[in-house]
Amino acid sequence: MINFSTNSDLILRESVVGSRRISNYWWASVVLLGASGFLIVGISSYLQYDLVPFLSAKNIVFVPQGLVMCFYGSAGILLSIYLWLTIFWNVGEGYNEFDKVNGLVRIFRWGYPGKDRRINIVYDIKDIQAIRVEIKEGINPRRVIYLKIKGTRDMPLTRIGQPLTLAEIEEQAARLARFLQVNIEGI
């Protein structure tokens, strides 16, 4: 989701929400709970004793069912740890800044820990040719605003995930094109 957090005649700054979305918290929690259940039942089948009273493993033979449940439980817990770390590190969060004073466009995002944790891409505002809007309807709809930049590939500005409504896409693209004084392509 893009929030227009700073608006003036000379600087436009849009905040971009990263991985700290409600849906990510939901899926990380569901995967952790489900994987924990699988792992507990798998271990219970090995021990021939119910570790948790409401998760009975009396009818489950350890080889192959309990072993497979342990494997899926372990894999699910690893996936859940990855999801929780992504949320903790807030991967994908950042901003798009369009600065007429200095003549710069700055696209900033937080990445995974390491030497490239801070993703900071800067372009000259004069290199922006247009704002391109891509709209694909169907089973997997896609609605993205791109910054068309001279000499490089188009830079996506909208978030990944739940697509924005047509009205929101049009309003954001129009506001950005008006600010940058460039054309809109694709609408």
UniProtKB/Swiss-Prot annotation:
The gene is ycf4. It is a multi-pass membrane protein. One of its GO terms (biological process) is photosynthesis. The lineage of its organism: Eukaryota, Viridiplantae, Streptophyta, Mesostigmatophyceae, Mesostigmatales. It is found in: Plastid, Chloroplast thylakoid membrane. This is Photosystem I assembly protein Ycf4. InterPro entries: PSI_Ycf4_assembly. It comes from Mesostigma viride. GO terms for cellular component: chloroplast thylakoid membrane; photosystem I. Keywords: Chloroplast, Membrane, Photosynthesis, Plastid, Thylakoid, Transmembrane, Transmembrane helix. PANTHER family: PHOTOSYSTEM I ASSEMBLY PROTEIN YCF4, PTHR33288. The chain crosses the membrane at residues 25-47, 62-84. Belongs to the Ycf4 family.
